[in-house]
Amino acid sequence: MKVALIGITGYGGMVLYQMLKTHPGIDQVDLYARHLAGPTPLNQLVPNLFDDQPVYPYDSQKILANDGAVFFATPAGVTKTAARPYLTAHFPVIDLSGDYRLKNGATYEKWYHQSPAATADLKVAHYGLTDFCDATDENLIANPGCYATATLLGLAPLIIDQLIDLDTIVVDAKSGTSGAGKKPTSSTHFTQVNENAQLYNVNHHKHIPEIVQQLQAWDPAVDAIQFSTTLLPITRGILATIYAKPKPGVNKDQVVAAFKQTYATDPFVRYTGENLPTIKQVVGTNYCDLGVLFNERANTIMVASVIDNLIKGAGGQAIQNFNQRFNFAPTAGLPTAPLLP
């Protein structure tokens, strides 16, 4: 099968490309970029890949004629217009940006500060949280955000089994600098990041509304969450530490049972119990590892959720959606060995 990838120069696109190249069901990955005037060798755009495959100027008609699916690893605001030819043709689109994650256009406009995609397109978009949905027969798949993935996988058993007080959810999420994207800023400059930890976008991060939207799909009574984000002096990985109060009568055994049952057959979510996971054990893999503590004295449940933001939080989950859509094995093309040491 041939697939197209638009957006190879960003971190997410680079990692996705490397996984697509080794996928057993993919024979060819056609590369496109919106800013090119003519074909350009990939190694001129991304030297560390040592690959001279041509990257072509973006051409939707060429993709429709030659490929079976298209991946967009582009910034927010691109896909909502660039995807239109594919949607008209019922051609499979997997979008790694936030353009189709939110069902309410006004919510997108509020959080992304730009106009939303067409209402009709938002209605048919499929939110591809692969551990809780099936992308079979879907032609517009919105890949979840990295913070959203780590947070939702950590909260799902507690929300679905109605084990916690919904007004007490606190998420303290920390990420490596690759989560901020490739474009350098003053906050991602080495001298600012090194030997430092800095909060940013507290309660204003763009992933908050998609988290709340999915939580409400599991329990409509969810109203809001406290959500903070911290930039760490590491390259990759997310640690989301989640706190909530149990409902009266809920005990540790119920919480443990909920996590074990929810993820019993999930190939990429590993419940580690009270052995709290570290970022290092998942970087380079498509795993989400979840550790859980029940503090009876403080009457608080704590969940530690770790993922690689560029794999499970981006390209890896995109491939999971691709595998579902085209009936490949759930683990096809996905890495399971961490980058150690």
Swiss-Prot record:
One of its GO terms (molecular function) is NAD binding. It comes from the Bacteria. It holds the Pfam family Semialdhyde_dhC_1. Its EC number is 1.2.1.38. It catalyses: N-acetyl-L-glutamate 5-semialdehyde + phosphate + NADP(+) = N-acetyl-L-glutamyl 5-phosphate + NADPH + H(+). CDD domains: AGPR_1_C (cd23934), AGPR_1_N (cd17895). Keywords: Amino-acid biosynthesis, Arginine biosynthesis, Cytoplasm, NADP, Oxidoreductase. GO terms for cellular component: cytoplasm. It is an enzyme of class 1 (oxidoreductase). PROSITE patterns: ARGC. The active site is at C146. SUPFAM superfamilies: Glyceraldehyde-3-phosphate dehydrogenase-like, C-terminal domain, NAD(P)-binding Rossmann-fold domains. It is found in: Cytoplasm. One of its GO terms (biological process) is L-arginine biosynthetic process. Pathway: Amino-acid biosynthesis; L-arginine biosynthesis; N(2)-acetyl-L-ornithine from L-glutamate: step 3/4. Catalyzes the NADPH-dependent reduction of N-acetyl-5-glutamyl phosphate to yield N-acetyl-L-glutamate 5-semialdehyde. Belongs to the NAGSA dehydrogenase family. Type 1 subfamily. NCBIfam families: argC (TIGR01850). This is N-acetyl-gamma-glutamyl-phosphate reductase.
